[in-house]
């Protein structure tokens, strides 16, 4: 590894913290893990953000059906105004996705989620009591900010607090919470459709999960990786005891030592003059058998004294602290304090692929059905136009499970190439259904489209962050999320106006055109990375985009 590569790979500490998983204290990870009531409460509580994400993005379909002009002091509620109400959440989510990582790194994952839930509550109340269009749009913008932050922070938090044995399950649970939240919003809207001003109740109900999260906040620990990066050993130890209730003091302390070793190695590339425990930006809380205190950097002698006297927290501390000073490997500049902002060409190519695939995820029209399904099917004089949206959301929910169990086994590229073709067929059938007023054909074709979408396109673009080197993942995840929300906002802001201008059937043809473009994009530029290490993923983008690297190398 060259000096430039070393500086580039290790320059961003906090983006790497979230990736320190596989080599962190194997002893504690190998313990049998049994979910207790308290640990279940922690993990379920952490997924409340995903539930709110799904509910607040799905609820708008039922709201638009029950919202009346006089409710907002209007003479008429135009399609453009409906589009503004709908798309304002996506606009807010764009800004939320930008704020997510800075907030999570500065205040911690737990506090950031608490801030999100507070915003969810405030926005829910504001939207429920809104008497003007402007006030309602402001409420939707506010909830969008919370959605954008939680969409980024919840998976990060879960990946950092989950034991390796259940990490995949917990991340899956978050996806289930999102799609389940959308389904719940449709079901509740259907049950409340005969109630006057039901849209106010639909908005108000979104405050309940947020209140539940705040009520159990004291039982949810901070990410150990974040707290150790801040030098708070005492809090890290308490968090680990909550997350691993069967672990002994030895296992907990081993985990802490391994975390410190990993993080200190990373910091060597920024400033190797002092190990993590005595770096100038860290204030270490340290508890030994008789005392607890705050150790500031100048108190090096006191630190040495404490570590020598402490047997439970850190054994052989003098040798341990000396070991942390190990040389930066491969000639990296140990005293480098400058942050490198230049991205390598291969990183730029990888980021473009991720953003483009996310663009196609949204421009192919999925959220047009999610947001406006009730309006779409109300044109066909269906007794309950909220029943088709429930079927659509149920299809999305069920086939999301299919995606989670096939992406790694079949490969993302292979499943994308197959399901995008099915999406295209579904949209073409939608166009026929609209053109001939065949509601049954329309419903079947939408279900086909949504099933294919949920099987790959709904999930795969979010995994493109794995194309990026560790020190660019936070930035790359924000870019990919921003692409999602901006394209989402564009589709939701123009859909009703478009169908009024060129008709439903032609709008479906436009979506079908973009799915064809997406297929060619995947075929020529989206590589398969199944089973590749981080270094090998980088090689895929070394000279252009080698989409056949896996097959040429391993088959």
Curated annotation (Swiss-Prot):
Name one process (GO BP) from the record: transmembrane transport
Task: Provide the alphabetized UniProt keywords.
Answer: Membrane, Sugar transport, Transmembrane, Transmembrane helix, Transport
The molecular function terms in GO held by this entry are: myo-inositol:proton symporter activity; transmembrane transporter activity
Primary location group: membrane
Q: Which InterPro entries match?
A: MFS_dom, MFS_sugar_transport-like, MFS_trans_sf, Myo-inositol_Transporter, Sugar/inositol_transpt, Sugar_transporter_CS
Which compartment or compartments is the protein found in?
Membrane
Q: How does it sit in the membrane?
A: Multi-pass membrane protein
User: What domain of life does the native source organism fall in?
Assistant: Eukaryota
Q: Which GO terms describe its cellular component?
A: fungal-type vacuole membrane; membrane
Extracellular compartment spans: 61-83, 140, 190-200, 378-384, 435-440, 498-506
Q: List all topological domains (Cytoplasmic).
A: 1-39, 105-118, 162-168, 222-356, 406-413, 462-474, 528-555
Return the annotated region ranges for Disordered: 289-313
**Residue ranges of the TM segments:** 40-60, 84-104, 119-139, 141-161, 169-189, 201-221, 357-377, 385-405, 414-434, 441-461, 475-497, 507-527
Database matches in Pfam families: Sugar_tr (PF00083)
Q: Which family does it belong to?
A: Belongs to the major facilitator superfamily. Sugar transporter (TC 2.A.1.1) family.
Give the protein's recorded name.
Probable metabolite transport protein YDR387C
| Lineage, highest ranks first | Eukaryota, Fungi, Dikarya, Ascomycota, Saccharomycotina
């Amino acid at each position: 590894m060259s000096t430039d590569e070393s500086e580039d790979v290790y320059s961003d500490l906090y983006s790497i913290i979230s990736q320190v998983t596989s080599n962190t204290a194997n002893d504690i990870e190998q313990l049998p893990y049994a979910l207790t009531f308290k640990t279940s409460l922690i993990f379920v509580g952490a997924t409340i953000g995903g539930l709110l994400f799904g509910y607040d993005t799905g609820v708008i379909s039922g709201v638009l059906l029950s919202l009346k002009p006089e409710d907002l002091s209007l003479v008429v509620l135009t399609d453009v105004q409906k589009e503004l109400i709908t798309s304002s959440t996506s606009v807010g989510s764009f800004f939320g996705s930008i704020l997510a990582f800075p907030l999570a790194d500065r205040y911690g994952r737990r506090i950031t989620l608490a801030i999100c839930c507070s915003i969810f509550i405030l926005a829910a109340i504001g939207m429920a009591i809104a008497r003007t269009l402007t006030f309602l749009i402001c409420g939707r913008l506010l909830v969008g900010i919370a959605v954008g932050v939680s969409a980024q922070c919840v998976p990060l938090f879960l990946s950092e607090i989950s034991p390796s044995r259940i990490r995949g399950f917990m991340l899956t649970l978050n996806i289930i919470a999102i799609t389940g939240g959308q389904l719940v919003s449709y079901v509740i809207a259907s049950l409340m459709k005969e109630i006057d001003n039901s849209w106010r109740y639909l908005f108000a109900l979104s405050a309940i999960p947020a209140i539940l999260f705040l009520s159990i906040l004291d039982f949810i620990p901070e990410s150990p990786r974040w707290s150790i990066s801040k030098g708070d050993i005492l809090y890290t130890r308490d968090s680990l005891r909550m997350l691993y209730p069967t672990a002994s003091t030895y296992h907990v302390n081993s985990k802490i030592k391994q975390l410190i070793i990993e993080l200190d190695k990373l910091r060597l590339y920024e400033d190797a003059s002092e190990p993590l425990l005595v770096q100038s930006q860290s204030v270490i809380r340290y508890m030994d058998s008789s005392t607890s205190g705050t150790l500031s950097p100048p108190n090096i002698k006191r630190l040495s004294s404490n570590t020598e006297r402490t047997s439970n927290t850190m054994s052989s501390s003098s040798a341990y602290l000396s070991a942390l000073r190990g040389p930066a490997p491969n000639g990296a500049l140990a005293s480098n304090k400058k942050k490198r902002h230049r991205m390598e060409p291969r990183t730029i190519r990888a980021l473009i692929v991720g953003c483009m695939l996310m663009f196609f995820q949204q421009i192919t029209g999925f959220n047009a059905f999610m947001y406006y399904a009730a309006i779409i099917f109300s044109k066909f004089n269906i007794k309950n136009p909220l029943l088709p949206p429930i079927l659509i959301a149920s299809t999305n929910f069920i086939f999301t499970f299919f995606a989670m169990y096939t992406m790694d086994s079949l490969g993302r590229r292979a499943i994308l190439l197959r399901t995008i073709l099915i999406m295209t067929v579904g949209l073409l059938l939608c166009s026929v259904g609209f053109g001939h007023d065949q509601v049954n054909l329309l419903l079947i074709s939408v279900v086909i489209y949504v099933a294919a979408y949920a099987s790959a396109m709904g999930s795969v673009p979010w995994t493109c962050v794995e194309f990026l080197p560790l020190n660019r993942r936070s930035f790359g995840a924000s870019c990919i999320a921003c692409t999602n929300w901006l394209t989402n906002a564009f589709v939701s802001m123009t859909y009703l106006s478009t169908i009024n201008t060129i008709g439903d059937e032609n709008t479906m043809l436009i979506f079908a055109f973009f799915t064809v473009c997406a297929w060619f994009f995947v075929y020529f530029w989206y590589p398969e990375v199944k089973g590749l290490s981080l270094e090998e993923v980088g090689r895929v983008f070394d000279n252009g985009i080698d989409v056949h690297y896996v097959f040429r190398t391993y088959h």
